[in-house]
Regions:
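Loop-helix junctions at membrane interfaces
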Residues: 1-154
C-alpha cells in the first residue's frame, strides 16, 4: 500500500508539473505542481513527499522533460517546503506560506547557479506564489479526504 501510494503521488507531482498556467505578463507562467506538492507534504508528511518528489524528478529526467538544472530547482523548492513543514506542521500557516518560501528558495538556487536576475526572477514568480498560497489549502483538503477514504476502505 505504502509503495503504491508513494508511486501515485510521484506521478501526480510529475504530471502536474507539465501543466503551466499562464500569467498576466509573458514569462510569469507557473506550474500547477507547486500547490499540489505543498498539499502532498501537508497531508502525507515530509518523508513520503520527498521520496515522491525525487521519483518525480527521476521520471522527468528519464522522459527527457527536464534536465539537471530543473531538478536542482525542484529539489530546492521541495526542501524549502519540507523544512517549513518540519518547523510548523500541517496547519493553515504552512499551506499559505510554504509554497512561496519554497519558490523563493528555488529562485535563490537559480541565482546561485546562473548568477543573474534574482529580483526579476522573484517578481516573475510572484503570481505563482500567490496562486500557490491561495490554492494549496484546497488541494490539502481534497487529499485529506482521499487519504481518509482509502484508509477506511482497507
Amino acid at each position: 500500500m505504502d509503495c503504491c501510494e508513494t508511486a501515485l503521488l510521484a506521478v501526480l507531482i510529475a504530471v502536474s508539473g507539465t501543466f503551466r498556467i499562464p500569467g498576466i505578463v509573458p514569462g510569469t507562467e507557473f506550474q500547477l505542481s507547486a500547490p499540489i506538492a505543498v498539499a502532498v507534504c501537508g497531508v502525507f508528511g515530509f518523508k513520503k513527499y520527498i521520496i515522491a518528489g525525487i521519483l518525480a524528478s527521476l521520471m522527468g529526467l528519464s522522459l527527457g522533460t527536464c534536465n539537471l538544472l530543473n531538478v536542482a530547482i525542484q529539489m530546492s523548492f521541495r526542501l524549502g517546503v519540507g523544512a517549513f513543514w518540519l518547523l510548523s506542521g500541517s496547519n493553515r500557516f504552512f499551506y499559505i506560506f510554504s509554497g512561496p518560501v519554497g519558490t523563493a528558495l528555488a529562485r535563490l538556487a537559480m541565482y546561485f547557479l546562473l548568477g543573474k536576475g534574482l529580483t526579476l526572477m522573484l517578481i516573475a514568480a510572484a503570481p505563482g506564489m500567490a496562486f500557490t498560497a491561495a490554492t494549496a489549502w484546497a488541494f490539502g483538503k481534497i487529499f485529506t479526504r482521499c487519504h481518509k477514504a482509502v484508509r477506511t476502505s482497507m
